[in-house]
């Protein structure tokens, strides 16, 4: 089934599966084709994390950048009250910490 033929709910399930696998290429393709869906990249999953939080936990800088490009809010707190920056710092993901801080510095919205 092509992505064009998938329903919005099917795309969201495929998105969640690609996120769990860290499949950046598949996620990029899905995000580009979600325009007709009411899909919120900032929605919280059953674990109380957004896709961005989960990508930071996994230490996947490429996926973090992709999600931010498609509107992931770096300021959102997870169920424990931690932002993506908090999670990155706690997890020792220095590359993600640097990216988030640099992005905030040159963005109109702060972390």
Swiss-Prot record:
ANK repeats lie at residues 47-76, 80-109. One of its GO terms (molecular function) is chloroplast targeting sequence binding. SMART domains: ANK. Gene3D superfamilies: Ankyrin repeat-containing domain (1.25.40.20). GO terms for biological process: blood vessel endothelial cell proliferation involved in sprouting angiogenesis; branching involved in blood vessel morphogenesis; Notch signaling pathway; protein targeting to chloroplast; regulation of cell-cell adhesion; sprouting angiogenesis. Signal peptide: none annotated. Keywords: ANK repeat, Developmental protein, Notch signaling pathway, Repeat, Transcription, Transcription regulation. Disulfide bonds: none annotated. Regulates independently canonical Wnt and Notch signaling by modulating LEF1 and Notch protein turnover. Stabilizes LEF1, a pivotal transcription factor in the Wnt signaling cascade, by blocking its ubiquitination. Involved in angiogenesis; involved in intersegmental vessel patterning during development. Belongs to the NRARP family. PANTHER family: MYOSIN BINDING SUBUNIT, ISOFORM O (PTHR24179:SF21), PROTEIN PHOSPHATASE 1 REGULATORY SUBUNIT 12 (PTHR24179). This is Notch-regulated ankyrin repeat-containing protein B.
């Amino acid at each position: 089934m092509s992505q064009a033929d998938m329903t919005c709910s099917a795309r969201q399930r495929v998105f969640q599966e690609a996120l769990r696998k860290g499949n950046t290429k598949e996620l990029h393709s899905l995000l580009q084709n979600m325009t007709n869906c009411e899909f919120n990249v900032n929605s919280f999953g059953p674990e109380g994390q957004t896709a961005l939080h989960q990508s930071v936990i996994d230490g996947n800088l490429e996926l973090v950048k992709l999600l931010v490009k498609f509107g992931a809010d770096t300021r959102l707190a997870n169920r424990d009250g931690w932002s993506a920056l908090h999670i990155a710092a706690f997890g020792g993901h220095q590359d993600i910490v640097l990216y988030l801080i640099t992005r905030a510095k040159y963005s109109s919205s702060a972390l």
